[in-house]
């Protein structure tokens, strides 16, 4: 059994007319997820910061409702049970610009958040994507936390929704942690789809200080399968996991594949050297049995099971009520 913290199936289908929920070019199609043994998949509702971002989110939420209606093999998180053979899904908001455009009153974000929570549980929210927005700085910037970001963190207090640091600048991530402490907020930081900067030095990966803060605060770190974030071969996956364990992350490491395919964003923003996006043997969601065998060749079964599903399951069930 596998639990995955991040894929872009909804964004693939929303942005590319030729794709659908069973299309293999998504790299996270329903058949691929089921073949990979995924029993709980976090579906990112993702938007870039631009005019119309809230409409993108609205369309992706509608696609999720269509998915549940048309595919009997897929069920909502509210129906999740570890013994079920169905694929269960939960939401995440990747970039709060999908809840609020740059010129709108702040209160509109809260209305939209509550409306989407009524459709499906939201596991986590990222304030930003790559760029700066009204909430703070994304991973391609050096901007920290802004006032609207502070207000949104306060709003999330006690709602059982994690705050995702995978697409923050380092400054924003540190500001978020400091603001949580300053206000005494019950808000758990995670990195849903990031690896370790000590192994692969790119901004989307975690520096040791942030990784250790996430671990210390009971959060999750989802291992990302994008080649540019991992490295060129299987050994690079193992190196990231070894590093995470050395930082004390045995109970924090999870899977956060970031599988997607065939869409203009983020492909159009990637440098040419980023292609192919994934390693050949680990290029779509059906690869999980093979990936877990790779882990078993090095790590004890206890660690493999924690990474595969136990850590994510414990976090989700402890922080989100059915």
Predicted segments, located by residue:
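An N-terminally biased module of ancient metal coordination in phosphate/nucleic-acid-related enzymes
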Residues: 1-43, 273
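Conserved, mostly hydrophobic/aromatic
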Residues: 6, 33, 121, 163, ...
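Active-site beta-loop-alpha junctions enriched in small/polar residues
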Residues: 6-10, 46-48, 92-96, 128-132, ...
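A metal-dependent hydrolase metal-coordination microenvironment
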Residues: 26-27, 32-108, 130-149, 154, ...
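Glycine-rich tight-turn/loop motif centered on a GG-T
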Residues: 54-57, 106, 137-151, 159-162, ...
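Histidine/acidic residue-rich metal-binding segments in metalloenzymes
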Residues: 107-119, 123, 139-162, 168-190, ...
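Short acidic/histidine-rich active-site segments
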Residues: 225, 248-270
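Mid-to-C-terminal alpha-helical segments outside catalytic/metal-binding sites
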Residues: 279-322
């Amino acid at each position: 059994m596998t639990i995955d913290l991040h894929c872009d199936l909804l964004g693939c289908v929303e942005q590319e007319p030729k794709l659908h929920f069973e299309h293999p070019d998504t790299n996270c199609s329903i058949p691929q997820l089921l073949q990979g043994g995924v029993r709980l998949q976090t579906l990112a509702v993702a938007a870039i910061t631009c005019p119309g971002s809230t409409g993108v989110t609205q369309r992706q939420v509608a696609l999720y409702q269509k998915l549940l209606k048309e595919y009997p093999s897929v069920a909502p998180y509210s129906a999740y049970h570890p013994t079920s053979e169905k694929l269960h899904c939960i939401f995440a908001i990747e970039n709060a610009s999908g809840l609020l455009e740059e010129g709108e009153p702040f209160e509109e974000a809260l209305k939209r958040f509550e409306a989407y929570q009524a459709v499906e549980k939201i596991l986590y929210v990222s304030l930003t994507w790559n760029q700066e927005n009204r909430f703070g700085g994304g991973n391609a910037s050096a901007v920290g936390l802004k006032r609207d970001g502070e207000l949104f963190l306060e709003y999330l207090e006690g709602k059982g929704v994690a705050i995702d640091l995978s697409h923050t600048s380092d400054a924003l991530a540190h500001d978020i942690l400091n603001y949580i402490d300053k206000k005494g907020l019950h808000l758990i930081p995670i990195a849903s789809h990031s690896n370790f900067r000590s192994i692969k030095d790119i901004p989307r990966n975690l520096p040791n200080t942030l990784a250790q803060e996430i671990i210390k605060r009971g959060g999750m770190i989802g291992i990302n399968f994008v080649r540019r974030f991992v490295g060129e071969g299987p050994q690079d996956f193992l190196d990231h996991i070894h590093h995470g364990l050395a930082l004390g992350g045995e109970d924090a490491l999870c899977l956060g594949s970031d599988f997607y395919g065939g869409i203009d964003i983020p492909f159009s923003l990637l440098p040419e050297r980023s292609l192919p996006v994934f390693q050949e043997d680990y290029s779509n969601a059906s690869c999980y049995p093979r990936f877990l065998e790779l882990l078993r060749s090095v790590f004890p079964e206890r660690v493999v099971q924690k990474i595969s599903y136990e850590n994510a399951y414990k976090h989700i069930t402890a922080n989100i009520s059915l």
